[in-house]
Amino acid sequence: MKKLILGTLLCLSVTIFAQSGNSMASILQKIKSQSKIDTQDKTVYDLMDEFYQKNLQADNDEMTPEFTHKLQKAVSDSNTKNIHLLYLFLMYQQHISQAVAEGKKPNPVFQIETMNLLESETKEVYGKLPAIIYIFKAEALDSGSKKEEAQMTVASGLKEYPDSIPLKVYSYLNTKDENLRKDLTQNHPNHWMVQQFGIK
């Protein structure tokens, strides 16, 4: 029953936020009150990292039915620790996917607030951030016309993850650094982001 309630909350959160102006912080508190927090359990961290590896770092989308099943299993398992982090992550992802599917621009206020919460909650639980949070936060800030903060987020992410292709792409787009351009075109010419942004 708890999972049904949380699942419903997850599905409706974007609509609730947009219609009533409820803050993500209040939604998070409802979700977090049902979550078992365990700083030693890396399941959710590993899922976010695997999502990043398969969806963003790989040359092409390598999402597999096995990974999708693993993700769905974690969401539906009442014993999943730190599930509030996974819910925040999926709320953000759902919001972006829904906006793209409807041909609309994502809500930057929702994006930024969700990513700020996910960043602080993930740091609180794990003491560090997976690369995907730096990427999503930079995208959120960029969509909210906070270009300088987005650039600082990308720079911070690259310090932690110097081999991250998406972070290198965003850094190059911000700085036009010739060394980054060479690295991307020589070492990652087939990466979907290099091709999407026409980096040559």
Label each residue range with its predicted role.
Residues A25-P106, Y126-A140, I165-S171:
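Amphipathic alpha-helical repeat scaffolds of TPR domains
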Residues K128, Y170-K200:
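Terminal, low-structured helical/coil segments at or just beyond the last alpha-helical repeat
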Residues E121-K123, G157, L184:
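Canonical positions in the second alpha-helix
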Residues M1-A25:
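Bacterial Sec-dependent N-terminal signal peptides
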Residues D61, K104, P108-Q111, K147, ...:
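TPR-repeat structural position
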